[in-house]
Amino acid sequence: MNKLIASAVIMFSSHTVSALELLVPAYFYPVDDGVTYWQTLADAAPDVAITAILNPDSGPGAAFDSDYAAVANAFQAAGGRLIGYVYTGYGARSEALVKAEIDRYYAQYGVDGIFLDEVSNLAQHLGYYQSLHAYIKGGFERNHIVANPGTQTPEAWLATADVLVTFESPAAEYAGYAPDPWTAAQDATRFAHLVYDVADADAMRTIIDTARAHNVGHVYVTDDRGDNPWDTLPTYWAAETAYAAAVPEPSAWAGFVAGLALLVARLRRRPR
């Protein structure tokens, strides 16, 4: 039995299927359409678990922005979780600068946690991210941490965040994604996938089903693409929130996992 099939079987037998949470990179400025997108997030928050990533200027920005504060406060009041974007330069950015931006997010926007971007998965940088983890967890009461390497990491990275983003790429690359075996034994809430350039609602549902099969508890799927695929909400947003919030019937879920395993087995048997 190949590695992916084994992982799928383990994940199905070991984990309860539940509603997914949406992790939304809300990289739209709150004017014109941007205000509408933020209001759409707030409107959905009572019905589906949403974590929105606040990103005024590749970080909190040099000065407080009242437009961002207004939409952020409304989103939180509706029940959404708000986390602030900070880039780490793959472990090369000064810890002092990163910590200063973390401080500004809490002081200016009252965030519920931090989104660490450009996260290295190299062993020599583990201590860097453990230090940031300790700083956030020790310094703030609301201290949810999402770390985004955008790819696989060693298991030790679980100590750096509450959620690891282990995939951030276009849909064309998702079909070939195979999770590391160690992830199967973890709770699905520890992992997130961000998938863009997903053409329509049917393709979105397939992506979400696949994320479930990979033991992923947080997901975001969009038809946006280009240099910044996170500057709009998907045209199928309503369908996505409904599908993420729904809990699949056990029989249907078992059938999907079995079908995924069969497909992988057939692909692996093709002559090269």
Where are these regions (language model features)?
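Hydrophobic alpha-helical membrane-insertion segments
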Residues: L126, A171, A258-L260, R268
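Positively charged n-region of N-terminal signal peptides that target proteins for export
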Residues: M1-L4, E249, R268-R272
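N-terminal signal peptide c-region/cleavage motif recognized by signal peptidases
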Residues: S13-T16
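Glycan-processing catalytic domains of CAZymes
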Residues: S18-A246
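Small-residue packing motifs within transmembrane alpha-helices
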Residues: K3, I10, A254-V257
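A short, hydrophobic C-terminal helix/tail in secreted or cell-surface proteins
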Residues: P248-R266
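Residue-level detector of intrinsically disordered, flexible termini
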Residues: I5-S7, S18, S251
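Hydrophobic aliphatic residue packing
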Residues: V9, V247-P248
